Structure formats: C-alpha cells, structure tokens
From Swiss-Prot:
Coiled-coil intervals, chain numbering: none
Activity regulation note: Inhibited by UTP.
Self-association and partners: Homohexamer.
Subcellular location, record wording: Cytoplasm
Organism: Synechococcus sp. (strain JA-3-3Ab) (Cyanobacteria bacterium Yellowstone A-Prime)
Chief place where the protein resides: cytoplasm
Protein name (database record): Uridylate kinase
Family: Belongs to the UMP kinase family.
EC number(s) given by UniProt: 2.7.4.22
Length: 254
C-alpha cells in the first residue's frame, strides 16, 4: 500500500445513498467492507464523519431562526449517531473499532485523547472521530484537517458523490471541467469550495495532501488508498513541481 496512516473524511450525505434522509444500510455495509479491506492490507485508518444526513446546522438555523451555536451542537450530536452506526458496521466486518468524541459522553464513546487515538491505530483499530471539534462555527472538514495533523496522517481522503473537483457543479453544468491536480492556493483563489478555507489553510500549513474521490463507485476506497490516480489531488505543489504523484503529473500534462 502507498500509505501507512490515513484519515478518511465521510460526509453525512454520503451515508444516505439515494435516500432523502438518514442512513442507507447497503451504503453503510459497502463502506465498512472497503474500510476493512484497507485495514487488512496494513493501513491505519482514522475516520471523521459528518452529520448532514440528519441535521444541517446552518440551513436549519437559518430556516428556524435558531442560534447558530446551538444548531452546530445539534449537528455535533448527529455526527456521533453516524459514528456509532459506522462503528457497528465496521466491527461486523471483523475490524476492531473505537469511537472518540470531542464532547464527553463516556457511556457510548471514549473522549478524544490524541495519544490514545494513535495507540489504537498502531494496534490495527479503526478510530472514528465524532462530535466534530467540539466547538461551534467549525465544520467537520476543519475537524478532519485538525485530527489528521494531530495523528500524523499522511493524507486526507475526502469521499464525495462526484469523482473529483470541478470548476462548476457537474450536475447543473455538463461541460464542467474536472481537475486532476490542484494546489491549496488554487482551491482558495478559485473559490472551489471543496473544503472550507479554514480546513484548506490547516492542510497547507501542515503540508497535508487531500484527495477528493467518488465514494459511490465500488472499490474506490481501496483503490485510492492503494495509490491509484483517481479523483483530484490537492497539495502544496503545482503540477509542474516535483512534489506531486508522478502519475497525476502525467495526467495533468506536466
């Protein structure tokens, strides 16, 4: 395998499948099976999961006139629901798993402790981080960047419903162009919104590459962790620099 330790960012929406709300059991089982195969290949896997399949903090706050901080706390609890569900699915796939939350809830999960999380990873356990960063006004993408830096992950894999980063929404713009390679600065200056600016800044500061890929294609989690050039690679360097993966550089025409 190309990587030793990774962080997988799953949006809550990714768990819905084609449902309008909640969790699709088939999608959950598929994700768990692929994560299990990656762990069996010797890769240490941490996961940050969102909660948008249950609660959309900013959207709900705006619609109901709810205080933003309160709405964000509800969203954090939604991520814990997803984390516990994902834990059960991965353990049924035969892989030991721990959930750590940024908000203490000792009856259902461990508190987030960096050194303990790293020790779990070293023992071959999947660690799922719930409750975001524990602070309102921060997204789960920012949490993913923060936790990846803290546990010394080599890369963040952001699983989405599209096969990379585009210059426009491919669902509404059929002529939208997909990028194979981007620098952090490209993402910020072009306002591509693959992650919020705080998350991108954290990744840039810690030189954490991001790979955005399509979760809906079976086997893609294993392929992308193996190093296959699928999706969009985002990093410190531009396509003409020496730091990007060679195959991606070839694809981008460098």
């Amino acid at each position: 395998m190309k990587y030793r330790r990774i962080l997988l960012k799953l949006s809550g929406e990714a768990l819905m499948g084609e449902r309008p709300y909640g969790i699709d059991p088939e999608v959950l089982q598929s994700i768990a099976s692929e994560v299990a195969s990656v762990v069996r290949a010797g890769v240490q896997v941490a996961i940050v999961v969102g909660g948008g399949n249950i609660w959309r903090g900013r959207k709900e706050a705006a619609a109901q006139g709810m205080d933003q901080a309160s709405a964000d706390y509800v969203g954090m609890l939604a991520t814990v629901i997803n984390a516990l569900t994902l834990q059960d699915a991965i353990e049924r796939a035969g892989i030991p798993t721990r959930v750590q939350t940024a908000i203490a809830m000792q009856e259902v999960a461990e508190p987030y402790i960096r050194r303990r999380a790293i020790r779990h990873l070293e023992k071959g356990r999947v660690v799922i981080f719930g409750a975001g960063s524990g602070n309102p006004f921060f997204t789960t993408d920012t949490t993913a960047a923060l936790r990846a830096a803290e546990i010394d992950a080599e890369v963040i894999f952001k699983a989405t419903k599209v096969d990379g980063v585009y210059d426009a929404d491919p669902k509404t713009h059929p002529q939208a162009r997909r990028y194979d390679v981007l620098s952090y600065q490209d993402v910020l200056t072009r306002d591509l919104r693959v992650m919020d600016s705080t998350a991108i800044a954290l990744c840039k500061e810690n030189q954490l590459p991001i790979v955005v890929f399509d979760l809906t294609t079976p086997g893609n989690i294993y392929r992308v962790v193996q190093g296959e050039p699928i999706g969009t690679w985002i990093g410190q360097t531009t396509p003409k620099s020496n730091g990007i993966p060679a195959r991606l550089a070839q694809e981008s025409g460098s």
